[in-house]
Regions:
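Terminal-region recognition feature
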Residues: 1-212
Length: 212
């Protein structure tokens, strides 16, 4: 990944401990110990292998009670992240399960897409963790060869693909900043240059509930 070397450098940075923040509605300090032993632990690229691992661990979770999902990733396939997020949404809506997100060390790119599936009141980060949010990228070569009408159709198809990807991206951006102090336009402005956010800053901006 283009940002891999920068990521390694960031991991070595040691930040000053931040003061504890108040706990939001539905969560109390006595429930924080749940985060020390996540039911689901995911680490590595967000891909089909992670999704298979995610499903296996999710199926093995207790049938009742809160579920904690810990994630460490430098990114991956955003569509896999959206699929995992949809599984969380369905479990929450149909079974009424409380599912908490715990980001550890790095929650980059597709990892932030997955985090967006959780409301702010259910998002946590460990100390010194970084979020990284950026725009989707595309690499595509269009070959114009054939009757003019077919060439126009090929160009339009490529344009529609880009426009649809932007719509999906903006849906994710809105979900990430919902109920936070970050404005959608601010995120959209910072995303093209890869926005790195330290855990304490993410908490202060209301992007996560707390840092543990």
């Amino acid at each position: 990944m283009a940002f891999y070397e920068q990521s390694v450098a960031i991991f070595r940075t040691v930040a000053e401990p931040a003061p504890a923040s108040p706990v939001g509605a539905g969560m109390t300090a006595t429930r924080y110990p749940l985060l020390a032993n996540p039911h689901i632990r995911l680490s590595g690229p967000v891909d089909q292998l992670m999704y298979t691992n995610f499903r296996q661990q999710l199926d093995a979770c207790p049938e009742e009670g809160t579920i904690v999902i810990a994630l460490t990733t430098l990114g991956g396939d955003p569509e896999v992240a959206r699929t995992m997020a949809d599984d969380i949404r369905l479990l929450d809506e149909h079974d009424g399960r409380e599912i908490l997100f715990l980001g550890k060390v790095a929650v980059y790119s597709a990892g932030a897409t997955f985090m967006a599936a959780f409301p702010v009141g259910r998002r946590f980060l460990t100390r010194h963790t970084r979020l990284m949010i950026h725009e989707r990228k595309i690499s595509k070569t269009i070959t114009l060869d054939g009757p003019l009408r077919m060439v126009v159709a090929s160009i339009k198809a490529a344009l529609h693909e880009v426009e649809h990807s932007i719509e999906i991206e903006e849906e994710g951006f809105r979900a990430i900043v919902k109920d936070s102090q970050v404005d959608f336009e601010e995120l959209r402005e910072k995303a093209p240059s890869n926005w790195y956010i330290e855990a304490e800053q993410a908490r202060d901006l209301g992007l996560v509930l707390d840092v543990i």
